[in-house]
Amino acid sequence: LNSIEELAYSLASRISGLKVITLPEHGNTWKGIIRNIRFAQKHQGDINHIFSPEIAYISLFLKGNVILTWHDTGTLLQSSSFLKRFIRKWFWFILPNRFAKHITCISQYTANEIKQITPRVKNKISIVYNPYNEVIHFHPKEFRKENPHILHIGTGMRKNLLRTIKALRNIPCTLIIVGILKQEHIEQLKKNHIQYKNYLDIPF
């Protein structure tokens, strides 16, 4: 398995009563945050495992035990606004980590980042490395000169999809996008005349 998300979907098919819930809103608008909190409260379980740091705030509103998994701290604390940095630090990092029953990090580097931001939680952090999936093998393939396929994994803000779309504007190719497309992505794909295919939760 290559990611915690893939592990979750794999376990859900094998363990009775285990459900994978995808929140309805992406991004951090107040409307989206409130909708996500209500959705999470409605679908919460006895144990709630939160995979994404971008939604760590929902842990503050759940009654069951919470496990937080941190891949990295990303750009959550990067903002020119002191108020935004303050809100994100407390409601995306400090309070969620304190309320969580346990915290997992995918590397020692990430664990050190979390300990630096929230020193109090250092004793409930475990490191669980992302595993390598043995079904993945390298297969040499001749480059497709006419209409090459370009793979883009992830649609989050840090994945830079919008700039990728603009960069490919005059290049005849097919953009293969793995992840949930937002309306702004679709609009830019049309505006820049990009031929594309979109996939979600691709099994091996």
Give residue ranges: language-model regions.
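Carbohydrate transferase catalytic cores enriched for Leloir-type hexosyltransferases
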Residues: L1-F204
